[in-house]
Amino acid sequence: NCLSELVEDCGGKIDMTRLPIGDKTLSAKEIIANESQERMGLLIDEQHLDHVKRIAERERAPMYVVGQTTGDAHFSFVQGDGVKPFDLDVAQMFGHSPKTVMTDVTVEHHYEGVTYTTNKLDSYLKDVLQLEAVACKDWLTNKVDRSVTGKVARQQTQGEIQLPLSDCGVVALDYRGKKGIATALGHAPQAGMADAAAGSVLSVAESLTNIVWAPIATDQAHPCAIENINLSANWMWPCRSQKGEDTRLYNAVQALSDFCCDLGLNVPTGKDSLSLSQQYPDGKKVIAPGTVIVTSGAEVSDIRKVISPVMVNDKNSSLYYIDFSFDKQRLGGSVFAQMLGKIGSDVPTVKNPEYFADCFNAIQELIQKGWIMAGHDISAGGLITALLEMTFANTTGGMHVNLHDIMQDDDDIVKMLFAENPGVVIQVSDRRKKDVKKFFEDNGIGYTKIAYPTPDKCLITVVKDDFKHDFDIDTLRDTWYKTSFLLDRRQSMNGMAQKRYTNYKKQPLDIHFNPSFKGTLESYGLDAGRWKKEDGISTKRPCAAIIREKGTNGDREMAYTLWLAGFNVKDVTMTDLISGRETLEEVNMIVFCGG
C-alpha cells in the first residue's frame, strides 16, 4: 500500500531481495502485505540519492533502496529468481476499482435507563471519579517528556499540584513569538452505543469545548473563531460484524457531516479501523463499540492567553454555567449510567448548531477581552466532575454551588450534576459582573451564575432549594487519583506507585522570584537579536557543540539557548565523531542533551 501509492502515476518495480526481512520463513504474500509499523516510503530523484543516504547514515536511520520507477504503468514485486508474485496495472489498483455496495438493515437497540436516588450521591460520585474516562491520567502523562522542543506553551499538568487537567495542548510556533498551534480531542463511545448519530455529534462537541480555551486566530475571510478550526475524524467501528452495524456507521458519519457543515467546519483528514471485532473458533464473537475520535486543531493568536481549568481562589469572583447543547439534560450514554452498569437510550445531543457556534465564539471573545480567569468543559462525569477538577490542582479553597437557576423540566439534582450535555464553566471577576451580563444578553447566550469560590474551605457545597450537600475536595481528589495509582502499580516497581499516590499532593509548586526579576531580556538590557547586527561581535563568539545520538531530544531548544547566550552552536552526532568528520578542535564547550 505504501510503495504502490508512491508510484501511482508512473508504475514501479520492487526488488524483494532488497527488503529487510527479519523472518526468513515469511511467504511472498506475507512480505508484501504485512503491516509492520514505524516505516516510511520515499520517492527520491536518483541524483539526490547519495545525499539522502549520507543523512540516513549520520542519523542512524536504516535506509534501503528497494526499487525504482518504470514508466510502464505497472507495479510489481520481483523475487530473486525473477518470479513476480505481484504484478498489476496501476489503473487496476487505483483508477477503476468498482464501487463497494454495502447492504444492511436498521436494527433498533433499546438500552435500559438508570434508576437512582439522591441519597447515594457520595457513592455515585466516588464510582464515577474512578472510571478511566474520568479518573486522573497521571500514570500516563508521567511517562512522556512534556517539554521537548522548548515550545510547549500548554502541557498536560496544571495548578500547584501539577495534575493532568488541561483541556487542550498548545505549542508555540517559534521561541520568541506569540502565535502557536492548539489541539484537542473528543469522543463519546457510550453515547454512540445508544445513538450513533448523537455519539458523533457529542464527539465533535467535546473536541470543540476542549479547544475553545485557546484563543483561535481569525482573518478577514473567517472572522468567527470556530470557522478557523480543522478536524480529523478517526472512525473505530465493527463493520459487518452483526446486522445493523453498517447502518449505525452510516448514520454516525451523516450526523458528523451535517453537524460540521452547519458549524462551517472542515474535516480534511482522518483514519478508520472498520474491522474491530474478533471471532473465535468456538463461534464466540467480541465486538468493539463503534465510536469516532475527533481531533481539533487551529492556529492560536496569543499563547499567553490560553485559559487554565484551575479555579482562582478569589472570593470576589463568580462561576458561570453556559449550556452549548440547547437540549434537555439527559443521562443516556453518560459515565453515570456506565457506573450503574447501564447505557440508557435517552442521549443528549446538540439541538441547535448555530447556537453552539454562537456560544463558542462568545467564549473566544471573552478570552480576547481577558475577562475569563479560569474555564473548564463539561463532558465525562458531568457538571460536578468539571467543578471538582477546577479545584483539585489547588491546595486550598473550595466553592459554593447553587443550582437554583439551572433551567430544567424537573428538579432532578442527579441530572444536573451528572448529565454530559456539552457546555462550559467559566470564572469571571465580580467587577466584570455587569459587563458579562450585558455581553451575554447582547449575543443571545444563555448563562447561569452557579458558584463562587470559598478560599477558606476545602469543600464544594451544593445547594438547591431545601437540598444541601458537602463534597470534600481532598477526599475526592484521592478517589479521582486512585485509578491512576492502580494502573501505575502494574507498570512500576519497588512501591514507587504507592509513594507517588501518598505524596503527590504534598509537593505543590511554590516558585518565588526576586522582586526585580521580570523574565524579559529587555529588563537586563539585552536584545535577543543582538548577534545578527553587523558590529563584529559575532566573530568573538565561543563555539559550543551539542553531542547527540539516536533518541536524543531537547537539542533544538538547547541550541537556541546557547545561541541566545552568545555561542556559535554546532550540531554533532556520534557518527560524526566515529567517522572523523568532526574533531571538536574548535569547540570550547560541549553539551549532552537527554533522550
Q: Residues of each region from the PLM?
A:
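Intein/HINT protein-splicing elements and their conserved insertion hotspots or analogous self-processing inserts
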Residues: 46-177, 189-192, 216-218, 249-251, ...
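A glycine-rich phosphate/pyrophosphate-binding beta-strand-loop-alpha-helix module
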Residues: 193-278
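Anionic-ligand anchoring segments at beta-strand to alpha-helix junctions in alpha/beta enzyme folds, i.e.
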Residues: 2-29, 393-404
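Flexible gly/pro-rich beta->alpha loop and the following alpha-helix that scaffold active-site loops
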Residues: 561-564, 569-595
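Glycine-rich and small/hydrophobic secondary-structure elements
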Residues: 7-10, 33-45, 232, 237-269, ...
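Short coil-to-beta-strand
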Residues: 175-184, 220-229, 585-592
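Short helix-loop-beta junction
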Residues: 6-13, 178, 390-397, 556-572
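Glycine-rich phosphate/diphosphate-binding loop of Rossmann-like nucleotide-binding domains
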Residues: 541-562
